[in-house]
């Protein structure tokens, strides 16, 4: 089954799915600043575009380009700065 999600007044949209018992989602973020909370640990891979992120405990912002990935701890949050429309894959670890 595919689960549709919309966040931040429709500026972030994703499609969630399960493959061989593993949950993932693919989506697009329009330019803007966002804060996401996590329940489970996540790995985010930038498919096209770029994400500038700051996780809880980080002192500086980090930029991830297409093909690069970062992980976020469960039960935490992270801030995103999106300058161009960006596609991503989120894997729930």
From Swiss-Prot:
GO terms for cellular component: cytosol. InterPro entries: Ppnp, RmlC-like_jellyroll, RmlC_Cupin_sf. Catalyzes the phosphorolysis of diverse nucleosides, yielding D-ribose 1-phosphate and the respective free bases. Can use uridine, adenosine, guanosine, cytidine, thymidine, inosine and xanthosine as substrates. Also catalyzes the reverse reactions. Keywords: Glycosyltransferase, Transferase. This is Pyrimidine/purine nucleoside phosphorylase. The keyword Glycosyltransferase applies. It comes from the Bacteria. Belongs to the nucleoside phosphorylase PpnP family. Its EC number is 2.4.2.1, 2.4.2.2. The keyword Transferase applies. GO terms for molecular function: guanosine phosphorylase activity; purine-nucleoside phosphorylase activity; thymidine phosphorylase activity; uridine phosphorylase activity. It is an enzyme of class 2 (transferase). The gene is ppnP. Gene3D superfamilies: Jelly Rolls. PANTHER family: PYRIMIDINE/PURINE NUCLEOSIDE PHOSPHORYLASE, PYRIMIDINE_PURINE NUCLEOSIDE PHOSPHORYLASE. It catalyses: a purine D-ribonucleoside + phosphate = a purine nucleobase + alpha-D-ribose 1-phosphate; adenosine + phosphate = alpha-D-ribose 1-phosphate + adenine; cytidine + phosphate = cytosine + alpha-D-ribose 1-phosphate; guanosine + phosphate = alpha-D-ribose 1-phosphate + guanine.
């Amino acid at each position: 089954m595919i689960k549709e999600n919309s966040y931040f007044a429709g500026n972030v949209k994703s499609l969630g799915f399960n493959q061989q018992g593993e949950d993932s989602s693919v989506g697009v973020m329009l330019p803007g600043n966002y804060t996401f909370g996590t329940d489970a640990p996540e790995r985010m891979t930038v498919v096209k575009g770029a994400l500038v992120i700051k996780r809880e405990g980080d002192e500086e912002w980090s930029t991830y380009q297409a093909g690069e990935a970062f992980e976020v701890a469960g039960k935490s949050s992270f801030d995103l700065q999106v300058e161009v429309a960006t596609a991503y894959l989120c894997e729930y670890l």
